[in-house]
Amino acid sequence: MDVDQAAIDEILASAEADTAEGRIDRLEKELDVLKGSVKKLLLDLRETLNNLENPFQNLQNLAEGALAGGASYQPPQIQVVPAQIPEPPKPEPEVEQPETETGPEPEPEAEPELKEVKEDEPPEEDVVRELDESKSAEPIPEVMEEVDLEGDSLQAYSFEKPVKRTTPKTADLITKYDIVTLFNLMEWVKGMLEKYNLDSLTLMLELFESAGYISKDARDFICKIAELVSLNDGFEDMLLELYRLHKLMNPADTSMDSKLLSLILDKRL
C-alpha cells in the first residue's frame, strides 16, 4: 500500500497548527501583517497631513520630477517690449481773422433790476407818514423831572416808553380739610384741653406758628376748634351735624360718604 507523503505532511501540519505553538505562530504572522498595514496607513495619513499643511510641497515635488525627467527643459523667456510714448500734438497755427467793424458790446442789463428794487421800496413820503402815524398811535408820555444842583432848580425832560404793569390777580386760596382730618383735629384738641387750658393751647399754637411749622390760617382754624370743643363735650355729634349740613348744601357731592362710613365702622363715631 502506497502512502501519500503529501497527505501525511498536510495532516502533520494541520496537527501542528492545532497546537498552542502553532496558533501563536499564526497569530504572530497575522499581527505582523496588521502592523505593516497600520504603518502604511499612518505613513499615508502623515503625508496627506503634510500636504495639507504645506501645499507648496506638491509643487516642489512636481518641479523636481520635471527636472529629473528632462534636464534640457528651459523656462519660457519673457520678452520685454518697451512701450511707445505718444508724441505731444503739435500746436495748430492760429488763423488770423480779419478785423471787422463791430458796434460796442451791449452792457449787461443791470438797470432793470435796480429799477425793480427801487419800485419795491416804498417812497420816502410813505415812510415818514407811517412813522408819524405810529407816533400818534402810541403817545410817549412826557415826564418832567426837577434836578436840584446847589440850590439851582433845573427842569429836565425825559421821554420814557410806558411799561405795562400787570398786577397779579389775588385768588382766594381756601384750604379744604376732609372729614377724617377734621375728626382727628377735634380729637387732638379734646385731648390737649384735658391736659391744658384754652389759653395755654392758644399760646402753644402761636409759638408753633412763629417757629414756621404752621400757617396763620391753620392756627386760627385750630383755635376755633378749641373754642368749640371747650364749649361742648360731644364733638362727634357736632361732626355728624356738619356732615348733614354738607349734604344739604351739596347733595351731589359724595366725597364725604366713604370717609364717614370708615369712621363709623371703626367705631370712632
Curated annotation (Swiss-Prot):
Coiled-coil segments on the chain, per record: 3-66
Region (Disordered): 83-142
Keyword Coiled coil: yes
Keywords recorded for this protein, A-Z: Coiled coil
Ranges of biased composition (kind: Basic and acidic residues): 112-136
Compositionally biased residues, Acidic residues: 94-111
Entry keyword annotation includes Coiled coil: yes
Protein name: Uncharacterized protein AF_1053
Species for this entry: Archaeoglobus fulgidus (strain ATCC 49558 / DSM 4304 / JCM 9628 / NBRC 100126 / VC-16)
